[in-house]
Regions:
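Bacterial N-terminal signal peptides
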Residues: 12-23
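Long, low-complexity, tandem-repeat intrinsically disordered regions
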Residues: 1, 24-25
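Bacterial N-terminal signal peptides that target proteins for export
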Residues: 1-14
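Formylglycine-dependent sulfatase
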Residues: 25-179
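Detector for intrinsically disordered, low-structure N-terminal pre-sequences
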Residues: 7, 16-18, 34, 85
Length: 179
């Protein structure tokens, strides 16, 4: 059985290999990591179409054709079939996605702790490989203005709200119609 530290070490090494191998790709290669909040793994038209090939019955057949942009991105890009959250709380899960580390390593174990600016994110590695990076949407890790590793930012503090959300840029300045 692989030890916990060995598994984390292997995962982190894999991330570094993937990111640094990206420098060999052409300048026109785009990387878009799209993450939705509280969405089932099979709640897109793309996955409903794939269900029979997975030996499963489509649970939401009405979804087919209702998520055309997500479906196209899935068909034209890489789709990870076995991605799992390691923490069922927004901020720790998001920090884990950004770093490849478990919450006890990166230090975010609740929704109020600011993201440590000295922790390396995949965005830092992409910047080192010559990529321009951006983060758009819910940050929800404390209230700090800094978004380590991202050149362009449009986020809001905390959980956000349904109407009148004020977005902030990479310097923490309000932007947009509700600024």
């Amino acid at each position: 059985m692989i030890s916990f530290d060995s598994a984390v070490s292997r995962f982190t090494s894999l991330i570094f290999v993937i990111v640094f191998s990206l420098s060999e790709l052409s300048a026109s290669t785009n990387i878009i990591l799209l993450v939705t909040d509280d969405q089932r793994w099979d709640a897109t038209g793309f996955m409903q179409q794939r269900m029979p090939s997975l030996g499963r019955t489509a649970r939401f057949p009405w979804m087919e054709g209702n998520t055309p942009n997500l479906d196209r991105l899935s068909l034209e890009g890489i789709h990870f079939d076995n991605g799992y959250g390691v923490y069922s709380l927004c901020s720790p899960a998001r920090a884990t996605m950004l770093t490849g580390q478990y919450p006890h390593k990166h230090g975010i174990t609740n929704n109020q702790t600011d993201f440590p600016s000295d922790v390396v994110t995949y965005a830092n590695l992409l910047q080192a490989a010559g990529y321009t990076t951006g983060y758009f949407g819910k940050w929800h890790m404390g209230t700090q203005d800094e978004r380590p590793g991202f050149d362009y930012v449009r986020t809001f503090y905390g959980q956000g709200k349904y109407f009148g959300t004020v977005f902030n840029d990479e310097n923490g300045n309000p932007v947009g119609a509700n600024a």
